[in-house]
């Protein structure tokens, strides 16, 4: 198998993992809005597992590049420039990966904002409860 063929296999596997992660981040939004803490913990564990899978695929990709005499931090764009075959498929995969990563990143920002709003709401309510239970001092 050529470098590009092996790389395409790894990138497709990473893409599938990222799709699953993306689905979880969208599901996480609904769980945060519903304030379902136990489900949030479950989904966070699933996210961690997927992130670990991605890390393993990245190590596999780095080993592949090393075995082909390339630096492990070489970009897909550089590989596309240097190799004649599989350029089109690598370009498509690169774009899909970039778009998916952007989507995950933006959804995570939304989720973080929702969590922050929930924390502020809880803090406000705790202060309200505390202030109504504390007798006034004169």
Task: Describe the residue ranges of each PLM region.
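Extended, charge-rich alpha-helical scaffolding segments
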Residues: 1-81
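Short terminal interaction segments
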Residues: 78-138
């Amino acid at each position: 198998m050529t470098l590009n063929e092996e790389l395409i296999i790894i990138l497709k596997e990473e893409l599938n993992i990222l799709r699953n992660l993306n689905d979880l981040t969208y599901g996480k939004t609904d769980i945060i809005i519903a304030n379902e803490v136990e489900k949030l913990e479950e989904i966070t564990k699933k996210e961690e597992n997927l992130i670990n899978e991605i890390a393993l695929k990245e190590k596999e990709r780095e080993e592949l590049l090393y075995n082909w005499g390339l630096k492990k931090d070489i970009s897909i764009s550089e590989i596309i420039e240097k190799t004649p075959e599989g350029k089109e498929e690598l370009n498509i995969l690169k774009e899909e990966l970039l778009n998916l990563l952007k989507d995950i990143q933006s959804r995570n920002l939304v989720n973080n904002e929702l969590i922050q709003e929930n924390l502020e709401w809880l803090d406000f309510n705790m202060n309200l409860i505390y202030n109504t239970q504390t007798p006034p001092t004169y």
